[in-house]
A protein has these predicted regions:
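Conserved SAM-binding loop of SAM-dependent methyltransferases across substrates and taxa
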Residues: 51-64
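Conserved class I S-adenosyl-L-methionine
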Residues: 41-50
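S-adenosyl-L-methionine
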Residues: 77-105
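Conserved beta-strand signature within the Rossmann-like core of class I S-adenosyl-L-methionine
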Residues: 139-149
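Class I SAM-dependent methyltransferase Rossmann-like catalytic core
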Residues: 3-36
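A short glycine-rich, Lys/Arg-flanked "PGG" loop and its adjoining helix->strand segment in the class I
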Residues: 129-141
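Conserved SAM-binding motif I beta-strand of class I
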Residues: 67-72
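Core SAM-dependent methyltransferase catalytic element
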Residues: 170-186
Length: 186
C-alpha cells in the first residue's frame, strides 16, 4: 500500500512531469510491449518510467545480451528505480531531451525501441518537440517508438514525425484508459 501512496504523492506533487496520479496497469504494459521482437533487440530506452510499472515487464522480456536504459527526472521515482537490482538495467537521472547525448556516453549508437510514458501533450511544446525529434533521430531504421497518452491530441504531432507508420490501440483496463501509439521508423 505504501508504494501506491508514495506514487500518488509524488505524481500529484509533480503532475506536469508525471502526467498521472496512478501507476500504469499491467494491461497497459502488456499492450505497449506486444509485438516487439525482443529476440532481435540490443537496446531499449524507456522515457519516464515512474515507479517501474512498465520497466519490470521490459526486463522480464529482455534477452541476456540486451540493455534497458531508463530516463527519469523525478528524484523519488529515480530512487525507486535504482532499487531494482538487475544487471541489464541502467537508470539515468536525465531529461529525455538529452537521449542521444546520454546514450552515446554509454557507448550505444542507436536504439532498437523507445518506450515512452511521458505526458507529451502537457509538456511544453518546445520540450516535447525536442524529445520527439531526438527520439526519432536516435532510433535504428525499422525501430519502434511506443507512446501512450490519455487522449488523441498528440496523434497529429506523431504523424508529422512518423508519417503513416503509426498503429493506434486503446487500453480500457487502465486508469485512466489510454491510447497506445506504435510508431515505426521506416
Amino acid at each position: 500500500m505504501s508504494k501506491k501512496f508514495n506514487f500518488f504523492k509524488e505524481a500529484v506533487k509533480n503532475y506536469k512531469t508525471s502526467g498521472t496520479v496512478v501507476p500504469s496497469s499491467k494491461f497497459l504494459a502488456k499492450k505497449m510491449l506486444k509485438g516487439i521482437d525482443f529476440k532481435a533487440i540490443k537496446l531499449v530506452v524507456e522515457l519516464g518510467p515512474g515507479n517501474g510499472a512498465i520497466t519490470h515487464n521490459i526486463l522480464n522480456k529482455l534477452p541476456a545480451n540486451s540493455i534497458l536504459v531508463c530516463f527519469e527526472i523525478n528524484d523519488a521515482f529515480y530512487d525507486e528505480l535504482k532499487k531494482i537490482n538487475h544487471p541489464q538495467l541502467i537508470v539515468l537521472k536525465a531529461s529525455a531531451e538529452n537521449i542521444k547525448e546520454e546514450i552515446l556516453k554509454l557507448g550505444f549508437n542507436k536504439a532498437d525501441c523507445i518506450v515512452s510514458s511521458l505526458p507529451l501533450s502537457i509538456i511544453p511544446n518546445e520540450i516535447s518537440d525536442t524529445i520527439l525529434s531526438e527520439s526519432y533521430a536516435f532510433l535504428k531504421q525499422k525501430g519502434q517508438f511506443i507512446q501512450y497518452q490519455y487522449s488523441l491530441s498528440y496523434y497529429k504531432k506523431l504523424k508529422e514525425v512518423f508519417g503513416n507508420n503509426i498503429t493506434l490501440n486503446f487500453e480500457p483496463f487502465n486508469f485512466p484508459p489510454a491510447f497506445v501509439y506504435k510508431c515505426s521508423k521506416n
